[in-house]
Amino acid sequence: MSKAGGCRGCGCRVPQRASWSLVAATAALCLVLATSVCTAGAAPMSREEKQKLGNQVLEMFDHAYGNYMEHAYPADELMPLTCRGRVRGQEPSRGDVDDALGKFSLTLIDSLDTLVVLNKTKEFEDAVRKVLRDVNLDNDVVVSVFETNIRVLGGLLGGHSLAIMLKEKGEHMQWYNDELLHMAKQLGYKLLPAFNTTSGLPYPRINLKFGIRKPEARTGTETDTCTACAGTLILEFAALSRFTGATIFEEYARKALDFLWEKRQRSSNLVGVTINIHTGDWVRKDSGVGAGIDSYYEYLLKAYVLLGDDSFLERFNTHYDAIMRYISQPPLLLDVHIHKPMLNARTWMDALLAFFPGLQVLKGDIRPAIETHEMLYQVIKKHNFLPEAFTTDFRVHWAQHPLRPEFAESTYFLYKATGDPYYLEVGKTLIENLNKYARVPCGFAAMKDVRTGSHEDRMDSFFLAEMFKYLYLLFADKEDIIFDIEDYIFTTEAHLLPLWLSTTNRSISKKNTTSEYTELDDSNFDWTCPNTQILFPNDPLYAQSIREPLKNVVDKSCPRGIIRVEESFRSGAKPPLRARDFMATNPEHLEILKKMGVSLIHLKDGRVQLVQHAIQAASSIDAEDGLRFMQEMIELSSQQQKEQQLPPRAVQIISHPFFGRVVLTAGPAQFGLDLSKHKETRGFVASSKPYNGCSELTNPEAVMGKIALIQRGQCMFAEKARNIQNAGAIGGIVIDDNEGSSSDTAPLFQMAGDGKDTDDIKIPMLFLFSKEGSIILDAIREHEQVEVLLSDKARDRDPEMENEDQPSSENDSQNQSAEQMLSLSQTVDLADKESPEHPADSHSEASPSDSEEAAGFAPSEQISGSTENHETTSLDGECTDLDNQVQEQSETEEDSSPNVSWGTKAQPIDSILADWNEDIEAFEMMEKDEL
């Protein structure tokens, strides 16, 4: 997400009839007032060091952009591990995330205005020519309306804005004649059919060539869309209208915003995550500031800044008051139910909320922005990157990190608002982590698991559009930028739109369809910029004083948010039945459950599910007791499963030219050397003969002292391990024989033994899917000598590695101890469903609504539970691990089955919890919402 370029750090008004000079002056005044909050709290960074870091950002951008142009263009995105372009239809489907790809050179368009911000005007001119020459917007492909708007339409408009700026300066782009604007207008008209609904909310997808509903369009049957998807259009559509004079675009975007405002929950003033585009009914009724809603709030405030329409600010202020009243539990931002805003909807937060501190800076609410940003920074320091989702006690919930820019964005705006050099140090940490953990020979690779350091073959276009832009601006002085950044507003994709658009085409109707606005008693809602010298007099350490109590919040404390006694559980009250005491065969216990509104459902597989219907409880107090009982079930289940899991392992390629930059996610074995308890194993790789490793090796001299590569199939894993161990191998990597399999699209599992005593196997054994294994095989074909590191977690890359002329000795193995693996904490038995590549196509037997709570347990009375109304505090006052654990699958191989079926252990308790669907939908929403 992104913030406005002008008017930083305040909620200042852009006058509706202001001249452009007054608008610019207002923006400049806001910045002057906002930058005086503090100038201390960290050692000042010298201009030389800032320039050095700025130059480092430029080099990193060149590495990413250059590799895209060399290896991927004209494809939409670069696949940095395999050094090729991602072309839709030619790669395995990743689900909704692929809806951003339209065969229109997405990364190039998304990077246009970044080139100008980074003072690469020649490259910008070349890129514009390539877009005009090569890009086709009439492809027969179904794309996301939201992603196409913010990335492609926004990219074209941002490129046009800076092209006309450069042309006016008289040095570059003298040939330019609004060609990018013409393309933007063409694309705008292609998106308009999506708005053909009774509500005015757009369909989530559209076919660029055939539109909606036609048989050949393959879309138009959807009924739901996310709030952000429908509410993040006004900036681009209004800019298109004001650039071209065609008012229809702004009118359609305004109608969608008006409808969302009308459908807000009137008592809480919150909006849900997904809405029916035909009826306006809320489909998912949880509300937060992260995935699915985030940029809706952002665009209300920025639409006011860009367009000068008071109604947008009034709506934003109403929502912001509700956010701070219900969702903000400093330093946390926790989702709640729109109808029951005092009850938390979940106990985890997603990475997209990292944009919110930056939006609060634009609003002028600095203190909570500093608090939340510092909390997020502590999570990053623990995991190197911000996990896609993390729990309220800061454990990993979803381990992926697709190189999101939102935290860098908030860091930039907090620095501009406070002048505190602390935020320069934060930016420096981001640069170091990107180079240390994400940089690969062909660009920067997304992190598949922040705990192991494994990579995903993915570099999204927003990484170039946003990350480098914000990092460069963080360290740049005004003279380093060839234009005045304060004259522009940033879209959610960090594209630049000129503020002078507020004075053009003002004939567009601003009919107020809002009922009434809530009177809000808050000085932050003033229509002028706050004077920070008055707000924070003589306190240069203001920001530091706010951060200090949060320094150890991740490692040493368990923040519990605000305890809402008046709306939550009775303080000190105990439920009549504790989860640990419950017995399904006890009639008295069943009667107590009935009183609390909890019923038992016997499932076909012999398990029992607990479901709470609050309205069926004997009283509101009993309903609260039932809710607490369900929460205890979750905690009990989590604790029971903690010690039953084995975490994934890592295979790290450390020889030239990789130097540890490529990390592959590997499955462990239930036998052999345990890498979490022993030293890592380092060695060169060699293929075994026979390749399946099912008989005595015929090339023992080739694998002696090396890590043997073996193909899956034909015999047991343990038999393969014994054969390569007898040949002198120091470790083994089993590569899947199912072509195209990948840890991106299949659940990781443990290699099981053969039913015999496996204590004789002393070497470590790891499993790689076909896609990951092919990376090693390709490296062998190209470089012959390939050295890898087998460990429980990717080793920090030593700078000395890249200075070594020759690879280390082939016999140099098991040197340097690995760090202890962080506990695995993903959703139980859902490794194959959490990924966006796996849509939620199998659900638990019961699917209660948002007013229901559900839990399941096995007949053995290993009980667990789930509730949508999670609180952040444990009942006994201790920090409780609320992470859901991944159920690793064990698998043996049969002699005569080349296509081995994957058996799993009995379905664990939590896999039937009632909020399973919501959890999966939330992850998929993150992939839709500017992943």
UniProtKB/Swiss-Prot annotation:
Any keyword ATP-binding? no
Which Gene Ontology BP terms does the record give?
A: carbohydrate metabolic process; endoplasmic reticulum mannose trimming; ERAD pathway; glycoprotein catabolic process; mannoprotein catabolic process; proteasome-mediated ubiquitin-dependent protein catabolic process; protein glycosylation; response to unfolded protein
Q: Recall the GO molecular function terms of this protein's record.
A: calcium ion binding; mannosyl-oligosaccharide 1,2-alpha-mannosidase activity
What is the reaction catalyzed?
N(4)-(alpha-D-Man-(1->2)-alpha-D-Man-(1->2)-alpha-D-Man-(1->3)-[alpha-D-Man-(1->2)-alpha-D-Man-(1->3)-[alpha-D-Man-(1->2)-alpha-D-Man-(1->6)]-alpha-D-Man-(1->6)]-beta-D-Man-(1->4)-beta-D-GlcNAc-(1->4)-beta-D-GlcNAc)-L-asparaginyl-[protein] (N-glucan mannose isomer 9A1,2,3B1,2,3) + 4 H2O = N(4)-(alpha-D-Man-(1->3)-[alpha-D-Man-(1->3)-[alpha-D-Man-(1->6)]-alpha-D-Man-(1->6)]-beta-D-Man-(1->4)-beta-D-GlcNAc-(1->4)-beta-D-GlcNAc)-L-asparaginyl-[protein] (N-glucan mannose isomer 5A1,2) + 4 beta-D-mannose; N(4)-(alpha-D-Man-(1->2)-alpha-D-Man-(1->2)-alpha-D-Man-(1->3)-[alpha-D-Man-(1->3)-[alpha-D-Man-(1->2)-alpha-D-Man-(1->6)]-alpha-D-Man-(1->6)]-beta-D-Man-(1->4)-beta-D-GlcNAc-(1->4)-beta-D-GlcNAc)-L-asparaginyl-[protein] (N-glucan mannose isomer 8A1,2,3B1,3) + 3 H2O = N(4)-(alpha-D-Man-(1->3)-[alpha-D-Man-(1->3)-[alpha-D-Man-(1->6)]-alpha-D-Man-(1->6)]-beta-D-Man-(1->4)-beta-D-GlcNAc-(1->4)-beta-D-GlcNAc)-L-asparaginyl-[protein] (N-glucan mannose isomer 5A1,2) + 3 beta-D-mannose
SUPFAM superfamilies, from UniProt? PA domain, Seven-hairpin glycosidases
The organism's place on the tree of life at top rank: Eukaryota
What's the short name of a Pfam family annotated to this entry?
Answer: PA
The UniProt record gives the binding positions of Ca(2+) as 492
Family designation = Belongs to the glycosyl hydrolase 47 family.
**Name of this chain's protein:** ER degradation-enhancing alpha-mannosidase-like protein 3
Q: Which organism is it from?
A: Mus musculus (Mouse)
